[in-house]
């Protein structure tokens, strides 16, 4: 069906800029954009449907490119403990931290995980998100990583959102492999990744390169295996220390390296040369009260594309609003509203390997967009929370969330 969406202003985000079109219109044909431009330049179109957007500002659908949406349990009790003076080490020694999430996730059924993840996902969708990446990583064995990835696929098949599934088996060391990190990495490479990829459950492979997780050498083994399986890679890197993980990611042409508070200028140079996107996660920075900022000057100087995401997870960023992350990126990292919006559209699509079809409003791309009742695009980063008045269009069809 061909639809004319008229009477709007557009921030198309082409090339990662606002790329504003005033007094504009969009023609969609099925799920794709057929025409976009000033309404006055549109010849009398043939269309089956005409929708008046009442002067709204239209942006691409938002893309949350780094989340851990599927997990069992709840760690708000630990949050309260930390604020009462209990250290993270004490919480972990008592069986808390990521170990508690792994236990709860392993104990939960697929249906239970789906139900809790669906509730969290609906918050993102109400914020204007039309594409989301979700990681495994709280199962840490084949059976439970498969369970999480199956839930992720199910969410993509049942909810009005495009979902990309990332296998993060190399997230932490499971209890049954205590003090045997090399053995666990071998298990991931020899058993888990080949099986999960063969079942069609994996779109990309991620790992956590950090002193409290896995070394660059161990991560490299995972990357080599991913390459043999023709799967792109991503990396949690330089969140708490500088181990050269982001340069390692660049060497393997990773889609993205994420967190990056402790990355160096040499890392930025390597990422720019490889086209690897820097995914910044202001929610985790805020929640952990970090003080080391990502090197924004180096990222800008060398032209590294910058994306923003919620990092939705139970331990370090229980963030249910991608728009709130826009404000945090501007306030904490001193990004401009234009940079921040590019970070959840154009560059977020690049971070998922989807830039040919998503992330900007251009002819031939997927017709995912949001018509916002706002005065200017910067309002999306300006307002702190709240459900802004909007109309969400996915694949050329208005969606009711």
Swiss-Prot record:
Binding site for N-formimidoyl-L-glutamate: 138, 313, 315
Protein name: Imidazolonepropionase
Main location: cytoplasm
Family: Belongs to the metallo-dependent hydrolases superfamily. HutI family.
Pathway as given in its UniProt record: Amino-acid degradation; L-histidine degradation into L-glutamate; N-formimidoyl-L-glutamate from L-histidine: step 3/3
Record-annotated disulphide pairs: none
Pfam assignment, any one: Amidohydro_1
Record: residues binding Fe(3+): 66, 68, 236, 311
Keyword Iron among UniProt keywords: yes
Record: residues binding 4-imidazolone-5-propanoate: 75, 138, 171, 239, 316
Swiss-Prot/TrEMBL keywords: Cytoplasm, Histidine metabolism, Hydrolase, Iron, Metal-binding, Zinc
Xref: PANTHER family: IMIDAZOLONEPROPIONASE, IMIDAZOLONEPROPIONASE-RELATED
GO biological process terms on file: L-histidine catabolic process to glutamate and formamide; L-histidine catabolic process to glutamate and formate
Coiled-coil regions, chain positions: none
Annotated compartments: Cytoplasm
Binding site for Zn(2+): 66, 68, 236, 311
Cofactor binding note: Binds 1 zinc or iron ion per subunit.
GO molecular function: imidazolonepropionase activity; iron ion binding; zinc ion binding
Catalytic activity as recorded in UniProt: 4-imidazolone-5-propanoate + H2O = N-formimidoyl-L-glutamate
Source organism of the structure: Pseudomonas syringae pv. syringae (strain B728a)
InterPro entries: Amidohydro-rel, HutI, Metal-dep_hydrolase_composite, Metal_Hydrolase
EC number from the UniProt entry: 3.5.2.7
């Amino acid at each position: 069906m061909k639809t004319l969406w008229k009477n709007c202003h557009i921030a198309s985000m082409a090339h990662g800029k606002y790329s504003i079109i005033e007094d504009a219109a969009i023609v969609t044909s099925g799920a794709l954009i057929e025409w976009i431009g000033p309404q006055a330049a549109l010849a009398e179109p043939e269309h089956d449907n005409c929708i008046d957007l009442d002067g709204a500002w239209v942006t691409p659908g938002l893309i949350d490119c780094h989340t851990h949406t599927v997990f069992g349990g709840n760690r708000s009790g630990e949050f309260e403990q930390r604020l009462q003076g209990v250290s993270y080490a004490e919480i972990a020694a008592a069986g808390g931290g990521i170990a508690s999430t792994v236990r709860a996730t392993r104990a939960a059924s697929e249906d239970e995980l789906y139900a809790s993840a669906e509730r969290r996902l609906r918050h993102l969708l109400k914020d204007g998100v039309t594409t989301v990446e979700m990681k495994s990583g709280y199962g840490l064995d084949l059976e439970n990583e498969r369970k999480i990835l199956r839930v992720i696929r199910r969410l993509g098949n049942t909810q009005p959102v495009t979902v990309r599934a990332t296998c993060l088996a190399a997230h932490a060391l499971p209890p049954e492999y205590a003090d045997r990190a090399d053995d666990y990495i071998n298990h991931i490479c020899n058993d888990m990744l080949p099986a999960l990829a063969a079942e069609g459950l994996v779109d990309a492979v991620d790992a956590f390169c950090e002193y409290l997780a896995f070394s660059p050498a161990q991560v490299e083994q995972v990357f080599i295996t991913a390459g043999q399986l023709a799967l792109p890679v991503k990396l949690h890197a330089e969140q708490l220390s500088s181990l050269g993980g982001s340069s390692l990611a660049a060497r393997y042409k990773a889609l993205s390296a994420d967190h990056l508070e402790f990355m160096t200028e040499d890392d930025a140079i390597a990422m720019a040369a490889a086209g690897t996107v820097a995914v910044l996660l202001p929610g985790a920075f805020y929640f952990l009260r970090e003080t080391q900022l990502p090197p924004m000057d180096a990222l800008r100087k060398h032209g590294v594309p910058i994306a923003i995401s919620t990092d939705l997870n139970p331990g370090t960023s229980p963030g249910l609003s991608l728009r709130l992350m826009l404000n945090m990126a501007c306030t904490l990292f001193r990004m401009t509203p234009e940079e921040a919006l590019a970070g959840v559209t154009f560059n977020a699509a690049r971070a998922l390997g989807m830039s040919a079809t998503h992330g900007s409003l251009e002819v031939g791309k997927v017709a995912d967009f949001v018509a916002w009742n706002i005065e200017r695009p910067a309002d999306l980063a300006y307002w702190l929370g709240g459900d802004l008045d909007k109309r969400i269009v996915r694949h050329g069809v208005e969606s009711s969330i």
